[in-house]
Amino acid sequence: MAKIVVTGGQALHGEVNISGAKNAVLPILCATLLADAPVEISNVPHLHDVITTVKLLSELGAEVTIDEGTLAKGRSILVDPRSVTHQVAPYELVKTMRASILVLGPLLARYGTAEVSLPGGCAIGSRPVDQHIKGLQALGADISVENGYIKATSHGRLKGGRYVFDMVSVTGTENVLMAAVLAEGTTVLENAAMEPEVTDLADCLIALGAQIEGAGTPRIVVQGVERLGGGHHAVLPDRIETGTFLVAAAMTGGSVTVRRARPETLDAVLDKLTEAGATITTTADSITLDMQGKRPRAVSLTTAPYPAFPTDMQAQFMALNCVADGVGVINETIFENRFMHVNELLRLGADIQVEGHTAIVRGAERLSGAPVMATDLRASASLILAGLVADGDTTIDRIYHLDRGYENIEEKLGALGATIQRTA
């Protein structure tokens, strides 16, 4: 099984291009099922979850063409949904990726029926699907859970309605939003997720002919239309990848510019990096972080839905706190079981104490390389970051987690001066 070996001690310097957002491209690919003509998606990242989604669309009968493109143009995917013949998303594909649940709303709205296996993916807590089910029921769907499958039917078109999410759910908002686009009448979604990826999905749907207002706010209003046509959409840059490279630069005392970025989607993260002592300069599509000659200061943070601090950056900031000056307190409010990286960081010499959903991190002068194991996507990134500043070699196992969400991370870090390689 492939591993990544990181030799610590090199400050990162240079420029890196940010890929398209994992958490935007997956729902957007699923949204192509709503159309009655081909849809082209560009700025698509090379990720395992994208491959899985393409397999799922193909399994449903869609014709999918991948254009690897060029370094400047990027990768694009053309989906022709006119050949869709199946409305069942099987366990074999869904079990490896939770985002597969996002075909539920589009299939139901377009074809009046859908069967989707209960999802798998990262092992970081329960992540219930009840918000998806309740939201679709509010649009008139009949839904049951039988033999591990969510089975949904509509009697004719879905009917517009009002739904208040019990809790903020990104994928729940996306699923119900996609279904509402083809529903009859007006749908109002309250307590909707405000993440930039939700807004990007809405922008894609609007480009195909949907009528949506309020995406990026807690209240989204959808005027249902009878059909969506074809079109093109470019996926927004990945704010979590952006944040990960900025933390890497801060931890190593380097200076890095990330390009093809969207600084306005990262306010909470940039505020914490500034608090840690970094000098940050932004343009419309780039961020430069300078930490040369400085040790980061410990920062305390609490994860919460956007625009607050993202749970997907929690593990990376824990790694930063491991070598920072002072004590940082991290409160995780989004997912349970999201401190699984703590035991691995302890193997590198970190000083971390966990009390329930809170981790207290005391910065150490240095970490020491050791064999460690990735437990989920963002945890794997935190172990690479820790390896960048640890003495000697850090060998990270189970890096298939990493390939679900980061495109060529070892090549990008290597180009910035890191000593990092993938081994068979």
Swiss-Prot record:
Main enzyme class: transferase
Pathway as given in its UniProt record: Cell wall biogenesis; peptidoglycan biosynthesis
Catalytic reaction list: phosphoenolpyruvate + UDP-N-acetyl-alpha-D-glucosamine = UDP-N-acetyl-3-O-(1-carboxyvinyl)-alpha-D-glucosamine + phosphate
Biological process per Gene Ontology, one example term: cell division
Binding site for UDP-N-acetyl-alpha-D-glucosamine: R98, R127, P128, V129, D130, Q131, D312, I334
GO cellular component terms, A-Z: cytoplasm
EC number(s) recorded for this UniProt protein: 2.5.1.7
Domain of life: Bacteria
Pfam families reported for this sequence: EPSP_synthase (PF00275)
Compartments it resides in: Cytoplasm
InterPro entries, per the entry: Enolpyruvate_Tfrase_dom, Enolpyruvate_Tfrase_sf, MurA_subfamily, RNA3'P_cycl/enolpyr_Trfase_a/b, UDP_GlcNAc_COvinyl_MurA
GO molecular function annotation: UDP-N-acetylglucosamine 1-carboxyvinyltransferase activity
Active site: C122
Transmembrane segments: none
SUPFAM superfamilies for the chain: EPT/RTPC-like
Residue positions, PTM 2-(S-cysteinyl)pyruvic acid O-phosphothioketal: C122
Similarity comment: family membership: Belongs to the EPSP synthase family. MurA subfamily.
HAMAP family hit by this protein: MurA
UniProt-recorded name of the protein: UDP-N-acetylglucosamine 1-carboxyvinyltransferase
Organism in which the protein naturally occurs: Xanthomonas euvesicatoria pv. vesicatoria (strain 85-10) (Xanthomonas campestris pv. vesicatoria)
Lineage of source species: Bacteria, Pseudomonadati, Pseudomonadota, Gammaproteobacteria, Lysobacterales
Gene: murA
